[in-house]
């Protein structure tokens, strides 16, 4: 069954939203992250997603103490991403009680290290974040979306699916933080070619209709802005995906 996965992006402990990954286009929400996650959990969320934007910019400033507190205080699975660049960072997050670690640019820039991480920590502990943009074909973007690589999305998926990859988080960059609706075509395409990969869809979720369109295609739908802005509630999202 497709799950709704509520997401929080944090900069220096504050809940924020960026538009298309741009730190200059930042909206700060006056929410306590722990209280917000507990609210989401109480409403029925089974998984939570956290992006450490401080750590993404500077790994030496990763918000580990806060992440550990959040992982300990909520009883559902927490997955964390944000510029993970090393095996040590993956281990530190898993040691904090994080269930899954999201790794992105490394998968394109250092496949050897990425494969080592998959092997060492297991495919259930790792989610590959493939941020994609449509050129002539879907290509993967790297470095917090600032540049498009020459790697085609389907080729990257083919490579890693043959190495035991199970979970991906795929974001259509053109949609993220825009509330313009999700790119259903993209997720259908991935699901048809790689039926054994669990897809988490991210970027642009603006309505319950978006959730409905992804039902049965994706294992999870990451929702940030729509929940923070009160477009729909967790309960409504769960009901929509259950029907």
UniProtKB/Swiss-Prot annotation:
- Fetch the HAMAP family from UniProt: HisA
- InterPro entries reported in the protein's UniProt record: Aldolase_TIM, His_biosynth, HisA_bact_arch, Isoase_HisA-like, Isoase_HisA-like_bact, RibuloseP-bd_barrel
Q: Which family does it belong to?
A: Belongs to the HisA/HisF family.
Q: Which residues catalyse the reaction?
A: 9 (proton acceptor), 131 (proton donor)
Which chemical reaction does it catalyze?
A: 1-(5-phospho-beta-D-ribosyl)-5-[(5-phospho-beta-D-ribosylamino)methylideneamino]imidazole-4-carboxamide = 5-[(5-phospho-1-deoxy-D-ribulos-1-ylimino)methylamino]-1-(5-phospho-beta-D-ribosyl)imidazole-4-carboxamide
- CC per GO annotation: cytoplasm
Gene from which this protein is expressed = hisA
Listed pathway(s): Amino-acid biosynthesis; L-histidine biosynthesis; L-histidine from 5-phospho-alpha-D-ribose 1-diphosphate: step 4/9
Question: One MF term from GO for this chain?
Answer: 1-(5-phosphoribosyl)-5-[(5-phosphoribosylamino)methylideneamino]imidazole-4-carboxamide isomerase activity
Its name, as the record gives it, is: 1-(5-phosphoribosyl)-5-[(5-phosphoribosylamino)methylideneamino] imidazole-4-carboxamide isomerase
Q: What is its main location?
A: cytoplasm
The record's section on Gene3D superfamilies has: Aldolase class I
Provide an example Pfam family for this protein: His_biosynth
Q: What is its EC number?
A: 5.3.1.16
Name which cysteines form disulfide bonds.
none
